Amino acid sequence: MSRPGRVAVLGAGSWGTAFAAVMGSSTSPEGRRADRIVLWSRRREIADAITLGHRNPEYLPDIDLPENISAVTDIHQAVSDAAVVVVAVPAQHVRETLTTVKDSIAEDAIVVSLVKGLERGTGERPSQVCASALGVPPERFAVVSGPNLALEIARGEPTATVVASESAETAEAIAAMTAGRTFRPYTNTDVVGVEIGGIVKNVIALAVGICDGQGLGDNSKASVITRGLAETTRLAIAVGGRPETMAGLAGLGDLVATCASPLSRNRSAGRLIGTGMGVDEAVASMKQTAEGIKSVSAVVDLARRHDVEMPISEAINAVVSGRLEVATLADLLLSRNLKSEGHRA
């Protein structure tokens, strides 16, 4: 990859904005970091606030953004001449967004996904959707995932993450663009495993949030987290991921952060559902997408196609689809036949 120069970030929510701030404050040498980052926002008032006041008043109102960040509402303008295009829109909008802008993206641009959800209907991971919508080859695609709660990153709290690409060179280039005083990227080539870890943890976080909303204790939540990791690992292996990825930042790390933090959208949505709020009402009460609710049916469908047993995900899918009362969920979360422990069990 030549000098990064200009970066486009599609999506000015909390994570897209925080990631733009990470790239804008990279401590990598000149030539390995971006000169300018342009956020794309659907809303004019947010774009103007970012460009003129260097703040995102809707999603990160108390965070000062680097001076090299601006925002626009014209998506074609955002990606024009960008060496790197970062995708930070909800999973169900990735295909539509990229199809719209396909002809404006440079042929040699690297596409980076921050998306943590499966596309409903196709069951495709973000990397597959990007490849289908843009025709981007694997060596020009990367995914960033890990215990990356946007507000903590924007505050400058120490965080580690994973940059995965089938091309080690591409992963290293994106890692260099994001490395900073408090942001430490690691690289690997397991795109599938990294994506599955980021996708399924949202479903497990819903389950933990429901347990919390029902007043269940730490034993219950720890059990769900641990067995949730096991079923995530089973699915990752079945679709081509590596088990060691699930023991790292993109698996265990992301799962723990998302299940434990009150900043987690999915845990928060689960907690609301656990207190008796309807799923639609819980979704409507949140500013941003809880990807677990949107993706759980696709996760379950993918698991069934590969004959992978995922009892926690199955139970959450039943709740989200209205086939199971939340009051009966706790009895089902760990209701499997007795067997030995392990991700293959």
Question: Where does each model-flagged region fall?
Answer:
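Rossmann-like NAD(P)(H) cofactor-binding subdomain of soluble oxidoreductases
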Residues: 65-158, 174-176
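NAD(P)-dependent Rossmann-like dehydrogenase/reductase catalytic/cofactor-binding core
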Residues: 208-212, 237-247, 251, 255-345
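Internal alpha-helical scaffold of NAD(P)-dependent oxidoreductase catalytic cores
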Residues: 93, 104, 129-140, 158-206, ...
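Short, well-ordered alpha-helices that flank and scaffold nucleotide-derived cofactor binding pockets
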Residues: 21, 25, 52, 99, ...
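Generic structural signal for well-ordered, non-membrane alpha-helical segments
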Residues: 12, 16, 43, 94, ...
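NAD(P)+-binding Rossmann beta1-loop-alpha1 motif at the extreme N-terminus of oxidoreductases
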Residues: 1-63, 69-73, 100
